[in-house]
Amino acid sequence: MLITWQDLSPETLENLIESFVLREGTDYGEHERTLEQKVADVKRQLQCGEAVLVWSELHETVNIMPRSQFRE
């Protein structure tokens, strides 16, 4: 189930994104990026619709994924 990021409080959204970024440990290439930069990147992706927040009823968790990978 999709969760609209605008429905979350700013603090909750920030915490979800930080948790996602820390969990993913994504490689950003030659230049290391700060946590704040990574969070800003994910937030921008949510705001422009490239990424979505997804609630898993099975696992009772929230995940962030590219919109193109989301299937209901």
UniProtKB/Swiss-Prot annotation:
Pfam families found in the cross-reference section: UPF0270
Coiled coil residues, start to end: none
Origin: domain of life: Bacteria
Family to which the UniProt record says this protein belongs: Belongs to the UPF0270 family.
This protein's name: UPF0270 protein YheU
Organism listed in the record: Shigella dysenteriae serotype 1 (strain Sd197)
Taxonomic lineage of the native organism: Bacteria, Pseudomonadati, Pseudomonadota, Gammaproteobacteria, Enterobacterales
Gene name as annotated: yheU
